[in-house]
């Protein structure tokens, strides 16, 4: 739902309203997908009309977020909760427990919900090369992205993350290493979190294209 004030200022909308605007937008999207005609007058949007063609089958909506309100919205308004790539396993499992409780409160069966997961993945022929790539491309981009006003827990003030510190920071968060290391990490998320749909982010700005294609 966004978190950077300049992005909201650019469009003249309030950062404080982002959650309510997001929820209203989701309700409107579902109405447009499923109803022949929509006459909608909400707090933020007013629409009278229809869209064509309609989806030939239901389109699942996966919602992210970590806060209690985000998890509640994912249960009430979405078809799955899809965690982002940076939370460690402990935080994943704690949020999953809350999300499943929200599903029950919403009258939904937790066992029927998909369990997707997004992870940053860096795989190379050797473990050493994978960690080298992770520092050079993944962590550098995290520092560029989150080094400003909103401090991501993975980002410190240092210009470079020592490999030993990088390993500690990314344990149970990222999937980094040689193929065997990556298989082991993915299986761990499957055994503990129950992931059934893994979204691997394999490309990071500046990373050699030939490496990605391999």
Could you describe each region identified by the protein language model?
Residues 1-214:
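Active-site-adjacent structural elements that line small-molecule/cofactor binding pockets in enzymes
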């Amino acid at each position: 739902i966004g978190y950077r004030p300049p992005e909201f200022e650019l469009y003249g909308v309030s950062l404080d309203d982002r959650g309510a605007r997001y929820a209203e937008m989701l309700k409107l999207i579902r109405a447009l997908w499923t109803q022949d005609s929509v006459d909608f007058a909400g707090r933020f949007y007013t629409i009278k009309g229809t869209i064509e063609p309609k989806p030939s089958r239901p389109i699942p909506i996966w919602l992210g977020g970590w806060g209690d309100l985000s998890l509640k919205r994912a249960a009430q308004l979405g078809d799955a909760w899809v965690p982002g790539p940076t939370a460690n396993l402990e935080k994943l499992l704690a949020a999953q427990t809350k999300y499943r409780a929200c599903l029950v409160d919403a009258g939904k069966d937790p066992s029927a919900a998909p369990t997707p997961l997004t992870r940053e993945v860096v795989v190379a022929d050797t473990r050493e090369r994978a960690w080298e790539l992770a520092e050079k491309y993944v962590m550098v981009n995290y520092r560029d992205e989150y080094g400003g006003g909103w401090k991501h827990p993975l980002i410190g003030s240092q210009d470079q993350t020592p490999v030993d510190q990088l390993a500690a920071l990314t344990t149970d968060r990222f999937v980094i290493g040689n193929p065997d290391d990556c298989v082991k990490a993915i299986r761990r998320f499957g055994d503990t979190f129950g992931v059934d749909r893994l979204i691997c982010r394999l490309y990071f700005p500046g990373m050699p294209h030939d490496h990605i294609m391999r």
